[in-house]
């Protein structure tokens, strides 16, 4: 479910490590106070534990919060380590993250800008 989550308009990740003992209220408070974002929007907020093998997702669905939790059996997420930062992800970056890849792919094809016909 979390690998192909399409219900949200935006996806944000809390960079660095989050204490995953926090529940809905603690994570929603973190979104509001630390990142100055509104947890009551159609946005998926992702948090990663210290071992990088589990993540929690917080999502508001019209009448209540959904708390998603995923623990990898093998491997780890390529999670950005910079503390106290939140990043917005493109749909492609979200897929890369869920597939175990870094969100910045140096070898990925970049969109072409400034097109002209020769």
Give the ranges of each region predicted by the language model:
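Polybasic/polar functional segments that serve as interface/processing modules
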Residues: 1-118
């Amino acid at each position: 479910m979390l690998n192909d989550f399409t219900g949200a308009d935006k996806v944000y990740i809390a960079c660095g490590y989050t204490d995953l003992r926090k529940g809905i209220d603690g994570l929603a408070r973190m979104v509001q106070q630390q990142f100055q974002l509104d947890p009551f929007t159609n946005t998926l907020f992702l948090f990663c534990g210290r071992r990088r093998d589990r993540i929690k997702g917080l999502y508001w669905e019209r009448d209540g919060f959904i708390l998603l939790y995923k623990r990898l059996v093998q491997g780890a997420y390529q999670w950005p380590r910079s503390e106290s930062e939140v990043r917005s992800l493109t749909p492609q970056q979200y897929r890369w993250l869920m597939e175990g890849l870094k969100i910045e792919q140096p070898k990925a094809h970049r969109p072409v800008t400034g097109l002209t016909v020769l």
